[in-house]
Amino acid sequence: MSGALKTAAAVLRATGEPLSVEEVDLDPPGRHEVLVRIAASGVCHSDFNAASGASATALPAVLGHEGSGVVEEVGEGVSSVVPGDTVVLSWLPACGRCRACTSGRPELCEGAMSQMVTGS
């Protein structure tokens, strides 16, 4: 893909205001990035906190970081998925080295859990 792709996104422009579905530009995938055609997306409590102002969020913000879909394109250096693969998105990347990751349970990544709880 060359140039930006037009896509729809749920955009928060101001806390306490409704999200607006807008057409936005999406750059092609960069190094270690994957372009996914979203089939389903969830809005979770952290999105609610951003929208209500309960957590500091740079605005405007695209909400709905939980999702699944099909890989459309991969950037340089991506070897774990190929176009056509069905994927579930993770908002916090797994380290790939801890006991949970090496035993096939990246959703329980010790590093990711620590980062989520402590921010470190």
Where are these regions (language model features)?
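Short structural boundary motif marking the start of a folded domain
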Residues: G3-A10
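Extracellular beta-rich ligand/substrate-recognition surface
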Residues: V11-P18
